[in-house]
Amino acid sequence: MSEMTPREIVSELDKHIIGQDAAKRSVSIALRNRWRRMQLNEELRHEVTPKNILMIGPTGVGKTEIARRLAKLANAPFIKVEATKFTEVGYVGKEVDSIIRDLTDAAIKMVRMQSIDKNRYRAEEMAEERILDVLIPPAKNNWGQAEQPQEPSAARQAFRKKLREGQLDDKEIEIDLAAAPMGVEIMSPPGMEEMTSQLQSMFQNLGGQKQKPRKLKIKDAMKLLIEEEAAKLVNPEELKQEAIDAVEQHGIVFIDEIDKICKRGGNASGPDVSREGVQRDLLPLVEGCTVSTKHGMVKTDHILFIASGAFQVASPSDLIPELQGRLPIRVELKALTTHDFERILTEPNASITVQYKALMATEGVNIEFTEDGIKRIAQAAWQVNETTENIGARRLHTVLERLVEDISYDASEMNGQTVTIDAEYVSKHLDVLVADEDLSRFIL
């Protein structure tokens, strides 16, 4: 679990997301409160529940990007789901309980990787011994079993030194590796994914673990052997329990597009299989219940839920009152301005302009963006958003792709050339499209 302070979390988010300070502060405080809660005594810790967050803002302003970056910072079980993927219990489609099952699967994977990393040094030693056994087979006793000498021979030590120095990396050896489990593909009817998963696990475990000889270079064999030996050092039961504890105490669920499961203006009629019904099914999860998974029972009382939506047609008040009450912290994300677009093009660590420069550099083409060129690109994107659909920062991708289309096409024949993208270049390539609303609607 991350021990970063709210200021450190915001600073890290600032490297990738421009503006939206209120949203960054809210998620950073929520993340820090997870750590604060774990410092309390057990009795009080049980009483402190997370304050769930509802992020409201137009499309393309950074809601989903905040979730993506938060997942990397949290160092905790994290899952992002789309609210529109679920239907009410009893109908064809995914049930909301599958959110917790998927979160538990993510936790199992995360804890397994942590456990493998913890045992990596010991696994490396064991993998090294297995390779040395192939290079210098140990002497065998009368029953054909390998004898373990009290001290390694001089030849074995010499090979060990060469192995560690990488002198034997390209030498081919034949070594026994665990065979991949039998793959059984089962087409699952909607809503029965859990049963299908259990059937697949059962078929994969049939016949036990088998060894299969493979011919590999030593450097490739070493990687596979380290993974295999590290996996042997992991206790499956301890791993399951640790993963379930991680989900219950530190789990974070990000529910995107929650506005799409609202009744539009509260006046929709007819069956609401994937709208109000889903909201009612979400209630127990958000409030706290116990969900059965293939790894064990998982309590959701202390899982943090962050919901987000554009709310362009519906409004937050169109959510059912019970769900509104369980999302007490409201954060509004602001629409992006021309100045925000300029900052998005230049400030993030891997901004779009940096990406295009790097892509073209692979073919020996140097692209330079001038300050007035950046301003003109930002103005063009903002203008198209205003006159057509406002899709936020995503419009920059469309505009830039159109702008460098000719360079991308001819890059292989432009080795060593420098292309300067200034205001004049941008105007030449985009002005006609931006001015014509019909063209910009279909092309930009």
Swiss-Prot record:
<dbReference type="InterPro" id="IPR027417">
    <property type="entry name" value="P-loop_NTPase"/>
</dbReference>
<feature type="binding site">
    <location>
        <position position="394"/>
    </location>
    <ligand>
        <name>ATP</name>
    </ligand>
</feature>
<dbReference type="InterPro" id="IPR019489">
    <property type="entry name" value="Clp_ATPase_C"/>
</dbReference>
<keyword id="KW-0963">Cytoplasm</keyword>
<protein>
    <recommendedName>
        <fullName>ATP-dependent protease ATPase subunit HslU</fullName>
    </recommendedName>
</protein>
<feature type="binding site">
    <location>
        <position position="256"/>
    </location>
    <ligand>
        <name>ATP</name>
    </ligand>
</feature>
<comment type="function">
    <text>ATPase subunit of a proteasome-like degradation complex; this subunit has chaperone activity. The binding of ATP and its subsequent hydrolysis by HslU are essential for unfolding of protein substrates subsequently hydrolyzed by HslV. HslU recognizes the N-terminal part of its protein substrates and unfolds these before they are guided to HslV for hydrolysis.</text>
</comment>
<dbReference type="Pfam" id="PF07724">
    <property type="entry name" value="AAA_2"/>
</dbReference>
<feature type="binding site">
    <location>
        <position position="18"/>
    </location>
    <ligand>
        <name>ATP</name>
    </ligand>
</feature>
<feature type="binding site">
    <location>
        <position position="322"/>
    </location>
    <ligand>
        <name>ATP</name>
    </ligand>
</feature>
<keyword id="KW-0547">Nucleotide-binding</keyword>
<dbReference type="GO" id="GO:0005524">
    <property type="term" value="F:ATP binding"/>
</dbReference>
<dbReference type="Pfam" id="PF00004">
    <property type="entry name" value="AAA"/>
</dbReference>
<dbReference type="GO" id="GO:0009376">
    <property type="term" value="C:HslUV protease complex"/>
</dbReference>
<comment type="similarity">
    <text>Belongs to the ClpX chaperone family. HslU subfamily.</text>
</comment>
<dbReference type="GO" id="GO:0016887">
    <property type="term" value="F:ATP hydrolysis activity"/>
</dbReference>
<dbReference type="InterPro" id="IPR003959">
    <property type="entry name" value="ATPase_AAA_core"/>
</dbReference>
<dbReference type="GO" id="GO:0036402">
    <property type="term" value="F:proteasome-activating activity"/>
</dbReference>
<dbReference type="GO" id="GO:0008233">
    <property type="term" value="F:peptidase activity"/>
</dbReference>
<keyword id="KW-0067">ATP-binding</keyword>
<dbReference type="InterPro" id="IPR050052">
    <property type="entry name" value="ATP-dep_Clp_protease_ClpX"/>
</dbReference>
<dbReference type="InterPro" id="IPR004491">
    <property type="entry name" value="HslU"/>
</dbReference>
<feature type="binding site">
    <location>
        <begin position="60"/>
        <end position="65"/>
    </location>
    <ligand>
        <name>ATP</name>
    </ligand>
</feature>
<keyword id="KW-0143">Chaperone</keyword>
<comment type="subunit">
    <text>A double ring-shaped homohexamer of HslV is capped on each side by a ring-shaped HslU homohexamer. The assembly of the HslU/HslV complex is dependent on binding of ATP.</text>
</comment>
<dbReference type="GO" id="GO:0043335">
    <property type="term" value="P:protein unfolding"/>
</dbReference>
<dbReference type="InterPro" id="IPR003593">
    <property type="entry name" value="AAA+_ATPase"/>
</dbReference>
<dbReference type="GO" id="GO:0051603">
    <property type="term" value="P:proteolysis involved in protein catabolic process"/>
</dbReference>
